[in-house]
Regions:
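N-terminal targeting signals for export/organelle localization
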Residues: 1-46
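Thiol/disulfide oxidoreductase modules built on the thioredoxin-like
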Residues: 6, 110-114, 121-167
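Conserved SAM/SAH-binding loop
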Residues: 45-50, 122-124
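Hydrophobic beta-strand anchors of alpha/beta hydrolase catalytic cores
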Residues: 64-65, 92, 138
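Short, conserved active-site loop motifs that form the nucleotide-linked donor/cofactor pocket
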Residues: 90, 116-117
């Protein structure tokens, strides 16, 4: 019994230290931010308007992928900021998530389309493969790899603190 107590006295403080070190060393300032690097999953889907086939091989360079849907209220809130980014020359590809094609097209007509192209992910397969849990979500892509991801509305503060910081740290040009 004394042996077990001695071991516990030694192990418990180490476990507590490890827990707090791990928790405190994380950047918790933006809980929706994720900086895991991974390749864009392979996909075969269609473009929203023309219904032409698209795959991951059709996407190149540095750009944002914005996951959105016509039924998403927060997407409407975020939309004005995406227009601002698009008008400043930032390439944005829309990933229309679990949405009816005609509803999505009508939504973009009503609120204007900031996207270079829109992938219609009607059943959410690509979004699921990318780890999407809902809309909106935005991914920063560099040469086929996700280098930053934000769950939730992107606004000026998130843009600067999450995406611009990653762009500068990675030395990429959008």
């Amino acid at each position: 019994m004394k042996q077990i107590l001695k071991i516990l006295v030694f192990i418990v403080p180490i476990c507590i230290f490890a827990f707090f070190y791990t928790y405190l060393s994380k950047d918790n300032s933006y809980p929706g931010a994720d900086y895991r690097v991974f390749e864009i999953p392979s996909f075969d889907l269609t473009e929203l308007y023309q219904k032409t086939e698209l795959s991951n091989e059709d996407l190149s360079g540095n750009f944002l992928i914005n996951v959105w849907a016509s039924w998403c209220i927060t997407c409407r809130v975020e939309h004005g900021f995406l227009e601002k980014l698009s008008n400043s020359g930032i390439r944005i590809i829309g990933l229309n998530y679990k949405d009816d094609r005609s509803d999505a097209i009508e939504w973009l007509k009503k609120y204007r389309d900031p996207y270079e192209l829109v992938i219609h992910d009607f059943n959410g397969s690509l979004a699921l493969d990318m780890g999407v849990t809902g809309a909106p979500e935005t991914f920063l892509i560099s040469n086929g790899k996700v280098i930053a991801h934000y769950r939730g509305e992107v606004n000026q503060i998130i843009w600067e603190d999450v995406f611009i910081k990653t762009i500068k740290d990675s030395e990429i040009i959008l």
